[in-house]
Amino acid sequence: MSDILNKILAVKADEVAAAKKYRSLASLRSEVEADKDARAALRNFEGALRQKIAAGNAGIIAEIKKASPSKGIIRPDFQPDQIATSYAQHGAACLSVLTDVQFFQGSPDYLKQARAACSLPVLRKDFMIDPYQIYEARSWGADCILLIVAGLDHGLMAELEACAHELGMHVLVEVHNGEELNAALRLKTTLLGVNNRNLRTFETSLQTTLDLLPRIPPEKLVITESAIVTPDDVKKMRDADVHAFLIGETFMRAPDPGQELNRLFS
């Protein structure tokens, strides 16, 4: 596990402990489980991706991200609601919203604002280590959570997945290498993200997705993440029968993120 990932996970553990002191898991869980209207308002994350792909289009998870540990501030003029609206207008299937405060300058409020601005399903993009965070995510309006295999053992991953599924949420499991893929394939979720960024070196290569593809069962929906910068990158993936993408920085650096999405996939 990389030093930066270790550091993030340690901070996450402190954050969750502090949150539980402010509000207990039992209290949060009872509120979420009692809110029938919120459950009825869940948006179908996987369904939105598959619907786009079935129509011959790319299934794009468009990310709303202000900053990152490796790049610093990515988008100084940061208006989550406007970005979400632009993404929806230009054909995104789903949104991914960073909620990590310390390392990515995200916020739960950004997720709420983005979801309120459009009808797209929303992923809480964060480092999930405790069921408490899943109940948080649902209370904020998230429809899907992310599990990063590099930071979790199988028992905890299975527990977190089961918690999300009980709440009607989808789960995107993220891998970077063969060992992580083996662990991910033990889960029930069909959403499999391949991160082309090495979390140890932060180097990126689309070859990561291409190398792992032959080992991924056909029922899994493969989502290639990071390193998609040009239309040629998109073509390379689609020629390999990868039609789902999670893209953040490329869109965030453009004057209009939605128009950049349209340019990249036109």
Curated annotation (Swiss-Prot):
* Pathway(s) where this gene product acts: Amino-acid biosynthesis; L-tryptophan biosynthesis; L-tryptophan from chorismate: step 4/5
Q: Which residue windows are transmembrane per the record?
A: none
UniProt record, GO biological process: L-tryptophan biosynthetic process
EC number of this enzyme = 4.1.1.48
Which keywords belong to this entry?
Amino-acid biosynthesis, Aromatic amino acid biosynthesis, Decarboxylase, Lyase, Tryptophan biosynthesis
One GO molecular-function entry: indole-3-glycerol-phosphate synthase activity
Q: What class of enzyme is it?
A: lyase
Pfam families, A to Z: IGPS
Describe the reaction catalysed, as an equation.
1-(2-carboxyphenylamino)-1-deoxy-D-ribulose 5-phosphate + H(+) = (1S,2R)-1-C-(indol-3-yl)glycerol 3-phosphate + CO2 + H2O
Top-level taxon? Bacteria
- Can you tell me which family this protein belongs to? Belongs to the TrpC family.
PANTHER family recorded for this chain? INDOLE-3-GLYCEROL-PHOSPHATE SYNTHASE, TRYPTOPHAN BIOSYNTHESIS PROTEIN
User: NCBIfam families, per this entry?
Assistant: PRK00278.1-2 (NF001370), PRK00278.1-6 (NF001373), PRK00278.2-4 (NF001377)
What is this protein identified as?
Answer: Indole-3-glycerol phosphate synthase
What organism is the protein native to? Answer: Herminiimonas arsenicoxydans
Gene this chain is encoded by: trpC
